[in-house]
């Protein structure tokens, strides 16, 4: 079964045929592609046409969804988009608190992981006293809501802290302190006196702390908590995060592969940063569950591999979970394709530590626009040997030429591509580096110049998609006459056996795609 990341193409020296470079290894891909360099046209769109298994892809402009969603749906995928600020009802909804495993030993850990991403959206650390205290408060508040409140969501948490029905703050903490989170006592919780209790111990402990600390400190903690929850006070964000049409575990465990397009629009992407960081971190955490040993091999608990295709990766700020995950998520069926503009952008976030670069087995470089990236690429590409000749002419005794002529030949090393050559790299070209192999000098793919890709990109995207966790079918949207005519035109072309085969197999048999691990150095 072929499920490939398409990263470029190269000319076969033997017969001058174009071969597509694909990567189906369990390792990760890092791309250096400056703005307006054609990364969508040459990397993202082709990969979405060729990757057969589950995928979650960042899609700020929603162009990936519009160009590839219908093709992936026709190929048997469950397709949807999560657009936190969507107002037209087309977005799937995702409530992060639904990821908390209630009535299990994991509930506290799940709540802490969620709230850590909320209180530290800039990845500055938890050293600040009020930040760490608000983390403690929000963790308890999340647990209280999933066990006892009707609106068990992050918007519900935000509303709780600002609820005008509480005459005093003390009433807020008393409600948490006396709530019955486990009415049947099935969890075996005990209070500080070792007596059975129906109130979650973490919730009770935090409520007591909030009641006992000085008023000024309590006010600062509460203000910090309200501030970090401010995003979820937006009615649009609240509407799209109050319930769940999918859980992140569904991406790898459904009967059918899932294609999920994450759409933090250009207008809202900065303020959506806490939600974006939370979303990606939960995908990793909830899909790296313990594996089982079967017949002498460790087997992951998933039905489909997952490609995490994240464009403008450094814009998420420093995400230590992704930095660390590069070393282990491949064993859980997760493959990452991280795209950044250049090395400078990556180093501004992660410093000189090159763990991101080192953690990606394949690196793809388009022509850089800054010298730091060009210098690093010069080092990565290595050296070659060039032959040089020097001629010297000896003079006769009276100083006239005409004596002996000698030729000296020597070999010297030089960079295979210098900084200047990198900076002048053609807009049509790219270079792929594969660990422990020579680099490949290739050509960029242009999806619209590949007939099948061009036809697929014209398929009209789904206006709405059936939720993974709700059997109710979405209402169809009105279709214009022009759009209906285009759909009929494309539908006719899809009726041919060849085209239907292409759609059904997602390129599995149509193209002879060269595996990228079969490499050749510069010719």
Which role does the model predict for each range below?
Residues 1-2, 312, 364:
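Short, flexible active-site loop motifs that bind/organize anionic cofactors or intermediates
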Residues 7, 24, 358:
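Structured loop/turn residues at beta-strand edges in well-structured enzyme cores
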Residues 1-8, 13:
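Single conserved hydrophobic/aromatic residue that forms the stacking wall/gate
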């Amino acid at each position: 079964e072929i499920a490939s990341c398409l990263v470029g193409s190269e000319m076969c020296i033997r017969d001058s045929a174009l071969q597509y470079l694909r990567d189906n290894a369990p390792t990760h891909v890092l791309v250096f592609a400056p703005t307006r360099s054609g990364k969508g046209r040459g990397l993202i769109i082709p990969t979405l046409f060729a990757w057969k298994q589950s995928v979650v892809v960042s899609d700020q402009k929603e162009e990936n969804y519009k160009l590839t969603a219908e093709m992936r749906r026709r190929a048997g995928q469950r397709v949807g988009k999560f657009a936190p600020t969507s107002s037209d009802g087309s977005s799937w909804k995702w409530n992060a608190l639904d990821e908390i495993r209630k009535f299990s030993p994991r509930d506290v850990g799940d709540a802490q992981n969620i709230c850590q991403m909320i209180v530290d959206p800039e990845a500055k650390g938890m050293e600040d006293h009020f930040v760490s205290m608000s983390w403690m408060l929000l963790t308890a508040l999340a647990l209280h809501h999933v066990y006892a409140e009707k609106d068990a969501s992050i918007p519900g948490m935000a509303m709780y802290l600002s609820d005008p029905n509480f005459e005093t703050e003390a009433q807020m903490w008393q409600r948490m302190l006396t709530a019955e989170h486990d009415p049947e006592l099935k969890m075996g919780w005990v209070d500080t006196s070792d007596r059975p209790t129906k109130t979650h111990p973490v919730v009770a402990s935090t409520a007591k702390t909030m009641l006992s600390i000085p008023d000024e400190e309590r006010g600062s903690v509460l203000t910090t908590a309200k501030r970090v929850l401010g995003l979820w006070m937006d009615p649009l964000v609240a509407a799209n995060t109050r319930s769940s049409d999918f859980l992140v575990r569904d991406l790898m465990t459904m009967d059918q592969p899932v294609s999920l397009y994450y759409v933090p629009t250009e207008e809202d992407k900065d303020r959506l940063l806490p939600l974006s960081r939370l979303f990606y971190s939960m995908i990793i955490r909830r899909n790296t569950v313990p594996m089982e040993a079967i017949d002498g091999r460790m087997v992951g608990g998933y039905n489909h591999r997952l490609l995490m295709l994240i464009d403008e990766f450094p814009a998420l700020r420093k995400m230590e979970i992704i930095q660390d995950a590069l070393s282990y998520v491949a064993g859980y069926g997760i493959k990452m394709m991280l795209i950044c503009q250049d090395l400078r952008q990556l180093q501004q976030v992660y410093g000189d530590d090159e763990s991101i670069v080192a953690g990606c087995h394949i690196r793809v470089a388009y022509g850089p626009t800054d010298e730091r990236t060009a210098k690093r690429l010069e080092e990565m590409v290595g050296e070659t040997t060039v032959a040089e000749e020097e001629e010297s002419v000896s003079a006769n005794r009276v100083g006239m030429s005409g004596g002996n002529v000698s030729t000296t030949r020597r070999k010297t090393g030089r960079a295979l591509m210098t900084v200047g050559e990198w900076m002048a790299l053609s807009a049509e070209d790219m270079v792929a580096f594969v660990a422990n192999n020579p680099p490949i000098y290739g050509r960029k793919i242009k999806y619209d110049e590949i007939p099948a890709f061009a036809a697929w990109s014209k398929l009209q995207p789904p206006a709405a998609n059936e939720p993974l966790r709700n059997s109710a079918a979405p209402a169809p949207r009105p279709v214009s006459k022009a759009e209906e005519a285009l759909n009929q035109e494309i539908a006719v072309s899809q009726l041919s056996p060849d085209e239907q085969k292409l759609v059904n197999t997602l390129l599995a048999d149509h193209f002879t795609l060269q595996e990228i691990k079969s490499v050749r150095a510069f010719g």
